[in-house]
């Protein structure tokens, strides 16, 4: 068997210890041990909750370039069958954050040995999948002190071949909001439905009616998605359910559409209360800002990537994906791009297995990009 690169090995280590948002204790310790093994002459390392900031001091800094990598996994039971599969039952790096971290460590390693003129700030961010680490990290005292002038991030894209970079100027990812709806009626015996108030029936009606919002209330040219991913109700087959809970997500390409969708959800839920004589409550949970790429920086990046020759550059369409990196881009100019990893299974799938060839190729490309950007006269 051929030897694997050090950063592929790191990815496999990290893949085995996925942790949920703000619980990335093992992950943080693993990263810190590696960072402490690097030359420390130009490094400043500070922790924030389960995240890490690493500043690489430049030789004659005029600006600071930021690079963000997210850290958390998902509550998914892995089904890849890989020898380095998750050791944490019911947890998986099913969104590629293990790949993101290994790439960041590869780039950091190079610049710890070969600093730029400008400063570099590596931001290892917890809780991207929820409840959202970017916004509080952005508001932290450390970020205020070390705030970069520009910031960059990537996300793996299973649908693109290895060697592909995809991005666009302006809006890249959607506004997103979690959605939780609780219904309370009156339970009873299945043989006497007229004496009870069935919340499973109410929940089913609500799911159907929510889909009419996208079909009939949102401008067809202004995309929106309402997905109910989980329904829970009832206790046993012969008891009418007194409670039901719906959990889902809202995604829109504009804040105006998000506001309209929420108004319609509230109106429809109120209608369910009246029609089914029940009580209902709505909680929107975590909300993520749209990812809006700085047009000039993104165009410059795409021009560099095309001239580089080592990657295939695609100008992609905006996606309904949610990413809390949008909060950082709302405050700091920068951009995000897709990195092709050629997997037959998509993000958040229990069998997602990114092609690891993408790791070293991404490291080499980002070293070239940051060297060009951070040494420019």
Curated annotation (Swiss-Prot):
It catalyses: N-acetyl-(2S,6S)-2,6-diaminopimelate + H2O = (2S,6S)-2,6-diaminopimelate + acetate. SUPFAM superfamilies: Bacterial exopeptidase dimerisation domain, Zn-dependent exopeptidases. Its EC number is 3.5.1.47. Keywords: Amino-acid biosynthesis, Diaminopimelate biosynthesis, Hydrolase, Lysine biosynthesis. Pathway: Amino-acid biosynthesis; L-lysine biosynthesis via DAP pathway; LL-2,6-diaminopimelate from (S)-tetrahydrodipicolinate (acetylase route): step 3/3. The keyword Amino-acid biosynthesis applies. One of its GO terms (biological process) is diaminopimelate biosynthetic process. Disulfide bonds: none annotated. The active site is at 70, 129 (proton acceptor). Belongs to the peptidase M20A family. N-acetyldiaminopimelate deacetylase subfamily. Catalyzes the conversion of N-acetyl-diaminopimelate to diaminopimelate and acetate. This is N-acetyldiaminopimelate deacetylase. It comes from Geobacillus kaustophilus (strain HTA426).
């Amino acid at each position: 068997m051929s030897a694997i690169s050090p950063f592929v090995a790191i990815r496999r280590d990290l893949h085995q210890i996925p942790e949920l948002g703000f619980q990335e204790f093992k992950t943080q310790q693993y990263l810190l041990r590696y960072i402490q093994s690097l030359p420390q002459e130009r490094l400043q390392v500070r922790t924030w909750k389960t995240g890490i900031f690493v500043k690489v001091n430049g030789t004659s800094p005029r600006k600071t370039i930021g690079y963000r990598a997210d850290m958390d996994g998902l509550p998914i039971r892995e089904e890849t069958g890989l020898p380095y599969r998750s050791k944490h039952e019911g947890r998986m790096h099913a969104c590629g954050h293990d790949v993101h971290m290994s790439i960041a460590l590869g780039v950091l390693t190079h610049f710890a040995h070969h600093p730029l003129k400008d400063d570099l700030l590596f931001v290892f961010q917890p809780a991207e999948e929820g409840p959202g680490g970017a916004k509080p990290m952005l508001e932290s005292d450390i970020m205020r002190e070390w705030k970069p002038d520009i910031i960059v991030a990537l996300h793996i894209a299973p649908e693109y071949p290895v060697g592909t970079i995809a991005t666009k100027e302006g809006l890249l990812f959607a506004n997103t909001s979690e959605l939780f709806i609780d219904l309370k009626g009156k339970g009873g015996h299945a043989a006497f439905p007229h004496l009870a108030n069935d919340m499973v029936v109410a929940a089913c009606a609500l799911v159907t009616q929510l889909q009419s919002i996208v079909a009939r209330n949102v401008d067809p040219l202004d995309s929106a998605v309402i997905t109910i991913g989980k329904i829970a109700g009832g206790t046993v087959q012969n008891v009418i359910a007194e409670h039901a809970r719906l959990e889902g997500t809202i995604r829109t390409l504009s804040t105006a559409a998000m506001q309209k969708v929420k108004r319609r959800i509230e109106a429809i839920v109120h209608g369910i209360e009246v029609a089914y004589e029940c009580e209902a409550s709505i909680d929107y949970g975590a909300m993520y800002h749209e990812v809006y790429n700085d047009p000039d920086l993104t165009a410059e990046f795409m021009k560099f990537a095309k001239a580089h020759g080592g990657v295939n550059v695609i100008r992609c369409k905006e996606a309904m994906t949610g990413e809390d990196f949008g909060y950082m881009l709302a405050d700091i100019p920068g951009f995000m791009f897709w990195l092709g990893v050629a997997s037959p299974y998509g993000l958040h799938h229990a069998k997602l297995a990114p092609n690891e060839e993408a790791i070293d190729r991404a490291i080499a490309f980002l070293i070239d990009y940051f060297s060009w950007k951070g040494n420019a006269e």
